[in-house]
Design a protein with these regions (language model features):
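Active-site-proximal substrate-binding groove within the catalytic cores of carbohydrate-active enzymes
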Residues: 22-25, 34, 40-266
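Short beta-alpha junction loops
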Residues: 2-3, 116
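Flexible, active-site-adjacent loop/turn segments at secondary-structure boundaries
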Residues: 12, 38-39
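Flexible glycine/proline-rich, aromatic-decorated loop/lid segments
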Residues: 14-28
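Active-site cradle of extracellular carbohydrate-active enzymes
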Residues: 3-18
Length: 266
């Protein structure tokens, strides 16, 4: 875990001149997270700090195979009007992408919080890519019918771990992991209680049950991780029964009403 956006005033390297500045000259600040008061580091500076930190880690004989640059893919692009390093939102994405590209150049697999189309060329995996309703307290009414739009385009491009919570006897997130051909989360703890889709009132499963469920999702992911998702449908027009088809011929049908699934080969 590492990140190059939240710019904490307590950091030895903090310099207000490198923070994102608005056109009126003000600098957005808050103290929502555990690091205390902060602003936002202008992304024009992020590649420098990424290279500095990972070079120092390497000097200590630590050989990393993967790194998680937090928040880059879950937050909108920043703008900066500091005349020394002005930046548009598009340029912000480009500078964030350079950070991922640097990791790749060092043989380090880059990851970030969610998935975004601008990051696809240089992102190998992510923290998660949940449907919108999964971020809300279980039982909150869904806004429409969730469908795998992102994976219909980018399934074979990014490894996506999925929530595996059984939130009630009528809702099991494992079914969405299977439908999307994703990787499973065996254990997923949020940084803070009841945030990022991590709630405490789910159905309690034994560790053995969690492992068995994860094995089922893992076996499917081994088959289809590098395959395109070619097709998604609501079977016979029933949105509670959905089916996806992958480019190797693997099909997955889930019945959200019965809480069941089938994996087959076409």
């Amino acid at each position: 875990h590492d990140q190059y956006r939240d710019f904490y005033k307590a950091a030895p390297s903090f310099d207000e001149n490198y923070a994102c500045r608005l056109p009126d000259g003000s600098i957005p600040e808050h103290q929502r997270w555990a690091g205390g008061p902060q602003s936002y580091l202008c992304a024009t500076q992020a590649p420098y700090y990424v290279k500095r930190n990972f070079t120092e880690i390497k000097k200590h004989g630590i050989r990393l195979d993967g790194a998680y640059l937090d928040v880059f893919t879950c937050n909108e692009g920043d703008e900066c009007d500091n005349p020394e390093h002005r930046m548009t939102r598009r340029e912000c994405y480009e500078f964030r992408g350079r950070c991922f590209e640097y990791l790749l150049s060092q043989g380090i697999l880059p990851s970030s919080e969610e998935v975004s189309d601008w990051a696809v060329p240089s992102l190998v995996f992510c923290h998660y890519a949940p449907y919108d309703f999964m971020m809300k307290k279980p039982g909150t009414p869904k806004e429409g019918v969730p469908v795998p739009l992102y994976n219909l385009v980018y399934h074979d491009c990014v490894i996506q771990p999925w929530m595996m919570d059984k939130v009630s006897e009528a809702e099991d997130y494992m079914l969405y992991a299977l439908l999307n051909g994703g990787a499973p989360y065996l254990i997923r703890d949020a940084a803070y209680p009841n945030i990022d889709g991590a709630f405490d009132d789910n159905v309690t499963l034994s560790r053995k049950e969690e492992i068995e469920r994860s094995k089922a999702v893992t076996e499917l992911h081994k088959q289809v991780a590098k395959c395109e998702m070619l097709h998604h449908e609501m079977v016979n027009g029933d949105y509670m029964v959905q089916e996806t088809t992958f480019s190797d011929g693997t099909g997955v049908r889930v019945d959200f009403r019965k809480q069941t699934y089938q994996i087959f080969h076409k």
